[in-house]
Amino acid sequence: MDQKAIVLDNSKSGSKQTKSSGKMQTQTDTNAEVLNTDNSIKKETGSDSEDLFNKFSNKKTNRKIPNIAEELAKNRNYVKGASPSPIIISGSSSTSPSGPSSSSTNPMGIPTNRFNKNTVELYQHSPSPVMTTNKTDTEEKRQNNRNMDNKNTPERGSSSFAAKQLKISSLLTISSNEDSKTLHINDTNGNKNSNAASNNIPSAYAELHTEGNSIESLIKPPSSPRNKSLTPKVILPTQNMDGTIAKDPHLGDNTPGILIAKTSSPVNLDVESTAQSLGKFNKSTNSLKAALTKAPAEKVSLKRSISSVTNSDSNISSSKKPTSEKAKKSSSASAILPKPTTTKTSKKAASNSSDSTRKKNASNKTTSAIKKESNAGSKLNTVKKENSSLSSIKATEKEKDKGGNSTEAKNSTSNVRKEPTAKSPKRLVAAPTVSPPKILQTAETKAKEPSILIDVPLYQADTNDYLDENGQVIFNLSTLIKEKYHPKSKELAQLKDSKRNLLMQLSDHSNGSLEKEKDEEGDVIELDDDEDMEEDEGEIDTETNTVTTTISPKKKSHPMKGKNLIGKYDVEDPFIDDSELLWEEQRAATKDGFFVYFGPLIEKGHYASLERANGTMKRGGVKNK
């Protein structure tokens, strides 16, 4: 018999469905879906099937045997659903979505996710859209197929009944046998007898499509209640190094080797069960937080009880039952709640009674949880694990109760000691009363006289004592205080005034004599102010009384006005240190002299001019011949 492709048609339109037929049909007049090695689909009629077979016979089909388990592990990084392969519903007019596997649906809408030889080649190469070559399709069929695709295509990541009942059957391997040149597509009924032999389908391929793996088995409602609460097992194929399929003794001799993923596998995750367990855990943590807020004083007992809760949770995790976890966490939460103790005699009795009640409550809750689990159909080994975990919980509770008793005793003793101190607090000294400020108080109180009060005129007054030649005010605070508050201040003021008046008169006489000498000789001679001051000081003692009587009240100019003050000190300046003036005068009076000069003191042919005591110049004197 000629080898020809088999058509798998799952459309719900008026066409015949191939699952009702028990034999593989070879249709020469109808169209066939042919998957080329380049992942492109070509439309060919039944009359050209022989040419198609010749093309496939010329191609080299010797390909490397893929390691499907490794490639499925790669796909786990990309797929986020409950299955490592996407849910794909293929019809006569639908296009396959991107993915390595192709699947079909039965009339009940349950995806079979059947992997055949063509899907393995698609798994190795880039995906390409599947096209139909049926020319006799009418517009009604296409419209019905579109409606069916829109209804049956589930969204990626959605948890539905199809996702829960999804079962990945074993993937076919590409054999290196050159006799099987054509691509075989298994029918939905999954017969393995005569058609497999006629179409050169290997026995390994035929064994995969048994009644257990067919669509009819998925259409049946789940008999056991386990399918409703637990997700279906993910079955993964395995291969040996030589390409043969390994067999699992648990599945039988006729079935190929299948690996059943363990419950700890990341593929077999139930979204609803995990959400329920998380909700229960959040409730238990909220109850613990409420207990902590009610009794914040006993922190040590709370920490130990929380550690016991975590230990009990770790022991119970082997059974993986959320009901038992809830019961144990509630019992531990009830153990956390403290009971206040009043006296030392009632502490021990109250602690013993509370411990007994806690143990009874915990034992009752755990036994009730075990009874519920046994009624639900739990096994004997889970009950044994629960009993072992109960013994460990009791041991931890005993240790916790011992530690709690010691901590409660310490806290109660500390409270008893602190009570008398709280009843009789120390009396604080009353704060001094401060009268509120009033407006009338400022007027009633008499202002005290200041210790020092100095008047410094900043403007031109009768006396220009503080004015500089530039009009700036200069004063010395210490001298002002001495002048005003010194016991002999009046006498000192009179002496100062007399000195100043004498200096003013002397300056006037000297200015008049200088003008006369200018007219006579035409020479400008500058007077030494220091010598004048020394001579005047000697004359003040004898003429103090007469000078004061002859002073005129008229304003006079500054005594140093009109003199060349470059390089000279202002004697009247209060800020100038007089000690420096005295030092210069002493240096000039010594024999060594202050200035370094080499040469005759008087030039040849000149006379040294001498100055009299009254300030007049004397002609003649020593002549240097």
From Swiss-Prot:
The keyword Hydrolase does not apply. Residues 29-39, 113-135, 155-164, 363-381, 404-415 have a biased composition (Polar residues). Disruption phenotype: Abolishes localization of HIR1 and RTT106 to the HTA1-HTB1 promoter. It comes from the Eukaryota. Residues 11-28, 83-105, 305-321, 330-355 have a biased composition (Low complexity). Residues 136-154 have a biased composition (Basic and acidic residues). Its main location: nucleus. GO terms for biological process: chromatin organization; G1/S transition of mitotic cell cycle; negative regulation of chromatin organization; nucleosome assembly; regulation of transcription by RNA polymerase II; transcription elongation by RNA polymerase II. GO terms for cellular component: chromosome; HIR complex; nucleus. Disulfide bonds: none annotated. Residues 1-164, 295-437 are annotated as: Disordered. Pfam families: HUN. Keywords: Chromatin regulator, Chromosome, Nucleus, Phosphoprotein, Repressor, Transcription, Transcription regulation. InterPro entries: HRD. Belongs to the HPC2 family. Component of the HIR complex, composed of HIR1, HIR2, HIR3 and HPC2. This complex may consist of one copy of HIR1 and HIR3 and two copies of HIR2 and HPC2. The HIR complex interacts with ASF1. Interacts with RTT106. Present with 238 molecules/cell in log phase SD medium. This is Histone promoter control protein 2. It comes from Saccharomyces cerevisiae (strain ATCC 204508 / S288c) (Baker's yeast). The gene is HPC2.
